[in-house]
Amino acid sequence: MAEALRRVLNAGCAARPGEDGAAGPPLLLLGAPRSAQTSLLFAAALEAAGEGRGSVLFVTRRPLQSLPLSTPTAREHWRLQKVRFQYPSSIQELLQLLASAHEAPAPTPSLLLLDGLEEYLAEDPSAQEAAYLAALLLDTAAFFSHRLGANGSCGLVVALETQKEAEADAPHLPLLKRYFPAQCWLQPDALGLGQHCCLRASLELGKLSPRTEWSVSFLPCGEMKVTPWLAQASKLSPEKKDSSAGSQSLTLGCDNLPGPGSPLDGILTSETGADSKT
């Protein structure tokens, strides 16, 4: 998953030499509430679905109310058909889903995504339960990788809401980092004033890996723009910042969302009526 997310943030660039078929290390996607974690997970799912290596398993507590992104890839039905959603409503249902993964007749996924880890851990906040769930997630991804064989490996990303990057503000973060060597932090980006939602995404693939950063902007119409984040950008005039960012931006279209004929029609309708995260 780390590689699928990196390619999303790198505007869909191809994998670097020697990385073809590599899923990358297990990754934690961290950010405050409403920091667009679901949107980035969905973008990574569509990216992986287009690689031709297998389906994508997207696990979340409740059905999405609508497509998190309005993008050209989100309107490609063949990509959407390769993303399979599962909605375990409790931590026990989640554990059962993972434990029975070897019995599932569905195609083996090349990417496993879990959204809203904090909601499941809230039911049993013990460190033992967090460690057990993390280990089971890794075991499930390893099992999928074994089944894929020569076709590649199964990536894993887990989204966890936390208020700050400080470990003291996330009780299980030090423990979870032992299982997930890669992390991507989503933080408010002060350089994005005037945008509907602007975040700074910081990606580290491991302790010895350099940190790579981007500015991610979401507009009301569903358009997402990604530009390299540069500390010196704060020293530029607004005109120069706009010019510099525009030359490297990824713009994902903001046309209307798919209509009733979309493969996700029905899947995206929540029976609970609860609001989904974006």
Swiss-Prot record:
This is ATPase SWSAP1. The keyword tRNA-binding does not apply. Its main location: nucleus. Residues 269-278 have a biased composition (Polar residues). One of its GO terms (cellular component) is nucleus. PANTHER family: ATPASE SWSAP1, PTHR28653. Interacts with ZSWIM7; they form a functional complex involved in homologous recombination repair and stabilize each other. Interacts with RAD51, RAD51B, RAD51C, RAD51D and XRCC3; involved in homologous recombination repair. Residues 237-278 are annotated as: Disordered. GO terms for molecular function: ATP hydrolysis activity; single-stranded DNA binding. The keyword Lyase does not apply. ATPase which is preferentially stimulated by single-stranded DNA and is involved in homologous recombination repair (HRR). Has a DNA-binding activity which is independent of its ATPase activity. The gene is Swsap1. It is found in: Nucleus. GO terms for biological process: double-strand break repair via homologous recombination; protein stabilization. Keywords: DNA damage, DNA recombination, DNA repair, DNA-binding, Nucleus. It comes from Mus musculus.
